[in-house]
Amino acid sequence: MEEEDITLEHSDDLNKEESGESNRVNIEEPEHHDNSNKESTNLDDLNMLEEPKYHDNSNKESTNLDDLNMLEEPEHHDNSKKESTNLDDSNMLEEPKHHDNSNKESTNLDDLNMSEEPKHHDSSNKESTNLDNSNMDESENQKNFKIEEPKPSGDFRNEGPKQCDDSKIEKPELHVNSKIEEPIHRIDSEHNEPEYHTESKNEESEHNTKSIREEPIHHVDSKNEEPVYSKIPEKMGDEFSENSLSKSDSAVKQEGNLLIHPNNSLKDTAPSKCKEPPVDEALSKKEISDDIAQITSVTPITEKIEDKDKYISEVIDTYGKLADGFEYRAKTFCLEGRGKVLYMLGTECSRLLGFKDSYFMFHKTPSLRKVLTTQSERDQMVEMGLLASNFRFRQLSIVPARQMFLAFGARILMKGTIDPESHKALIEKNISWADDEYYHMDVMANGSTRSSSVKLELKSMDNQNSPSPFQGKDILTLAQGASFYNSKVMRTRNLRKEARLSYYTKLRGVNRSVS
């Protein structure tokens, strides 16, 4: 009985230990199963069975490691998880290439590292293809063991402490880090197409495309521009020929199918537009000098003007009278005291020529002489029927007919024509006014001016009696007179009030005495 009790107690202790350890395993199992489920989607059946063994060993090793080792190991497992979940089936096939690079690097390591690397490859899923036959046999035994017992058994517990030595744990971590960092550098240098550097790939591709696009354009410009600018001669003559430009055009046509010019053709560029016809070879310096002499040997301008003066004198005389066959559009008249000179109304001329008012006509054509009329002259025009009676007392200006003819030419004529060149020559010669001999009369009488913008030389007779503008003294005198008037009015009012009062007081006194 005692032996049975001892065996029961021993079995109970074992069950407690197993239950305690199973609890530990159960606590760790969810992480183990979750990781296996994530990786099972992309791995084959062989890899599915090998993964739990690696994770079980890591869980047992983590129990004996310090807190730092506990924090470092999950980083290694997280990297494997991220890589397994993000890679497609095609990437799964390419992974052995990555491990081949790591195997090449492992040859340069020490013998100790070489002996320890297979252990790491036994636990990893990606390096199982490169193991020896002995490792393959162990993996098959582990597969069978896992198929029979999916849950971890006591064998895993016994294997765990053997692999938990510090020397065996720290060194693989260093090799794992070197394997993670160095292949990335080699992948960038060899393939230039890693998933980690997508931005650099795009930048390189854009840079390559830009260089490919820019180079042909640069070559086309250099090929096409050189013949155009270099072959244009400095001196125009026998050396010039269109062959230099035709060669460049033909070069563009031949290369047009392969290369594209930015302007599509050289005809649109500036050099092609600068083409000039070749100079005739027959011409020489002597012939050119002879032509220049013929051009310069022309009758002088003075001779032409004299001829034109004769021609103009046949059309109009100094008083403004036209020859036979010519007629003014405006009415002309003569005034007493002004001789035989013909005059026109400024308002009528401005209306016929299209000006808004006579003021604008005189302002735009300062060569015209504006003559101001007197009251007697206005009365004469009213009697002749040239002016309405209501304009008799208004200011009016008249213009000599010859000046209107010289200023406007055929525009002021109703009949007859005249050569415009001769008309311009007369103006350039500064022919004297048509009525110079009567000009002193206008100055003395009315103070006529050549234009409205010029000041009056003398005051007209109408303006002699006009009052002068107000000044400061005049304003003071007006103010003093107003104050004197107001004081005088107030005095008269006060006298009237006093007279009323005295009158009423006298009436009251009389009435009282009577009563």
From Swiss-Prot:
Positions with biased composition (Basic and acidic residues): 7-37, 50-59, 73-85, 94-103, 116-125, 140-226
Subunit (UniProt): Component of the SWI/SNF global transcription activator complex composed of at least arp9, arp42, snf5, snf22, snf30, snf59, sol1, ssr1, ssr2, ssr3, ssr4 and tfg3.
Localization in the cell: Nucleus
Function: Component of the SWI/SNF complex, an ATP-dependent chromatin remodeling complex, which is required for the positive and negative regulation of gene expression of a large number of genes. It changes chromatin structure by altering DNA-histone contacts within a nucleosome, leading eventually to a change in nucleosome position, thus facilitating or repressing binding of gene-specific transcription factors.
Natural source organism: Schizosaccharomyces pombe (strain 972 / ATCC 24843) (Fission yeast)
Chief subcellular location: nucleus
Family annotation (Pfam families): CRC_subunit
The UniProt record lists the keyword Transmembrane helix: no
Polar residues composition-biased segments: 126-136
Gene that encodes the chain: snf59
Superkingdom: Eukaryota
InterPro entries: Chromatin_remod_comp_subunit, CRC_Rsc7/Swp82
Region (Disordered): 1-226
Family: Belongs to the RSC7/SWP82 family. SWP82 subfamily.
GO biological process: chromatin remodeling; regulation of transcription by RNA polymerase II; transcription initiation-coupled chromatin remodeling
Protein name per the record: SWI/SNF global transcription activator complex subunit snf59
GO CC, one annotated term: chromatin
Keywords of this entry: Activator, Chromatin regulator, Nucleus, Transcription, Transcription regulation
